[in-house]
C-alpha cells in the first residue's frame, strides 16, 4: 500500500511537507492500524494492491471522531465503483467501532474524491479538526454517523 500512496499522491501534487505521503505510518500501516478502534482495508486484484483506506481515532480530536485516512487508488482501479464500496466499508466499520463522526482531509484537485465524499453524505467544513499534521491539505469534510 505504501507504493500506491507514493504513486498516487504526486499525481495530485501532494508530495511535499504537510501531506500524508510523509507520515511515518506509510511504511508500517499494519502496525498503525492494529491499534484499538482502527482498521485498514486493501483492494487487491490478481495479487496486486490497487488501493486502500482506513479509519483511526482523529489525532487531537474528540474520542467519538474518527478520521478516514490514506484512501488512495491506482489509476486502473478508479472509476469502477471500488472507491464507493471501500468508503462505505470504512463508514460501516467506524459505526461498529463506536464512532459518531467521521472526518477527512483532502486537497484542491482531488475533485473525484470530493464528489465521492459528498455523495456519501460528507459535508464540507470551514477548517480542519484535530491535529493531523497535514497542514498542506485545504479541504475538510465530516460525516455524522
Range-by-range predicted roles:
Residues 47, 81-83, 98:
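Conserved G/P- and acidic residue-centered "switch" motifs that form tight phosphate/ATP-binding loops
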Residues 74-76, 80, 108-109:
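Active-site acidic-Proline motif in GNAT/NAT acetyltransferases
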Residues 2-76, 87-89, 93, 126-130, ...:
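Acetyl-CoA-dependent GNAT
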Residues 1-2, 97-101:
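Short, mixed-charge, low-aromatic patches
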Amino acid at each position: 500500500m505504501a507504493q500506491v500512496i507514493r504513486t498516487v499522491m504526486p499525481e495530485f501534487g501532494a508530495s511535499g511537507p504537510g501531506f500524508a505521503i510523509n507520515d511515518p505510518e506509510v511504511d508500517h500501516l499494519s502496525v498503525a492500524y492494529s491499534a484499538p478502534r482502527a482498521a485498514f482495508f486493501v483492494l487487491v486484484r490478481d495479487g496486486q494492491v490497487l488501493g486502500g483506506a482506513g479509519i483511526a481515532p482523529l489525532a487531537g480530536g474528540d474520542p467519538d471522531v474518527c478520521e478516514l485516512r490514506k484512501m488512495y487508488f491506482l489509476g486502473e482501479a478508479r472509476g469502477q465503483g471500488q472507491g464507493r464500496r471501500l468508503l462505505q466499508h470504512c463508514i460501516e466499520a467506524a459505526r461498529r467501532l463506536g464512532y459518531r463522526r467521521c472526518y477527512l482531509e483532502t486537497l484542491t484537485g482531488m475533485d473525484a474524491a470530493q464528489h465521492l465524499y459528498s455523495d456519501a453524505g460528507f459535508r464540507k467544513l470551514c477548517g480542519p479538526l484535530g491535529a493531523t499534521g497535514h497542514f498542506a491539505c485545504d479541504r475538510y469534510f465530516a460525516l455524522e454517523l
